[in-house]
């Protein structure tokens, strides 16, 4: 089974992500060792919490460059929730620079009379990259689970893989470009749809492993 490094940088419970990856047919390895990131077949960067502590913890553990190197090498990479946001250059939530792997900013939802912030609960994805490997074997407009007050705004619209609409605001819910994929929602909390998305990622990892 492919070994997937789940990056541990003290930002949230990793247990449910690991359980999801196991169900999808992978062997998760929770780690903050740059060497183990290099040896793994793929990397998952999960995370819940605030932007500034997240990037501070990553940098304190010396993980910024190993993550950038892994992505540049073509290793399959999946960011989840905060693990999507910190790939960007900056966030309205904090003052720390993000990893800057993706050009663009993290913005806060504008208040509207009939919406709650954080955006919390189930919402429907609208696919903007219909052929992305993440969406294989999914129904159209699938429901997935969100908990967030901020969303990513990439400069290049072509990397946007899906959007959601909250009130009158349509925002990026997932990005995908070559081996780099990341989602704002929680696949590990999104029932069978989420498991299929994780399985699609694991299938791509398996394809890249030399026979």
Curated annotation (Swiss-Prot):
Residues covered by the Glutamine amidotransferase type-1 domain: 3-211
Entry keyword set: Amino-acid biosynthesis, Cytoplasm, Glutamine amidotransferase, Histidine biosynthesis, Hydrolase, Lyase
UniProt pathway annotation: Amino-acid biosynthesis; L-histidine biosynthesis; L-histidine from 5-phospho-alpha-D-ribose 1-diphosphate: step 5/9
Active site positions: 81, 186, 188
Domain of life the protein comes from: Bacteria
Principal subcellular localization: cytoplasm
SUPFAM superfamilies per UniProt: Class I glutamine amidotransferase-like
GO cellular component terms, A-Z: cytoplasm
Catalytic activity line of the entry: 5-[(5-phospho-1-deoxy-D-ribulos-1-ylimino)methylamino]-1-(5-phospho-beta-D-ribosyl)imidazole-4-carboxamide + L-glutamine = D-erythro-1-(imidazol-4-yl)glycerol 3-phosphate + 5-amino-1-(5-phospho-beta-D-ribosyl)imidazole-4-carboxamide + L-glutamate + H(+); L-glutamine + H2O = L-glutamate + NH4(+)
Enzyme Commission number, as recorded: 4.3.2.10, 3.5.1.2
GO biological process per UniProt: L-histidine biosynthetic process
GO terms assigned for molecular function: glutaminase activity; imidazoleglycerol-phosphate synthase activity; lyase activity
InterPro entries according to UniProt: Class_I_gatase-like, GATASE, Imidazole-glycPsynth_HisH
Keyword Cell inner membrane in record: no
Compartments where found: Cytoplasm
PROSITE patterns per the UniProt record, alphabetical: GATASE_TYPE_1
HAMAP family (UniProt xref): HisH
Description of how the protein assembles with itself and partners: Heterodimer of HisH and HisF.
Protein function: IGPS catalyzes the conversion of PRFAR and glutamine to IGP, AICAR and glutamate. The HisH subunit catalyzes the hydrolysis of glutamine to glutamate and ammonia as part of the synthesis of IGP and AICAR. The resulting ammonia molecule is channeled to the active site of HisF.
NCBIfam families attached to this UniProt entry: IMP_synth_hisH
Protein name, as recorded: Imidazole glycerol phosphate synthase subunit HisH
Gene: hisH
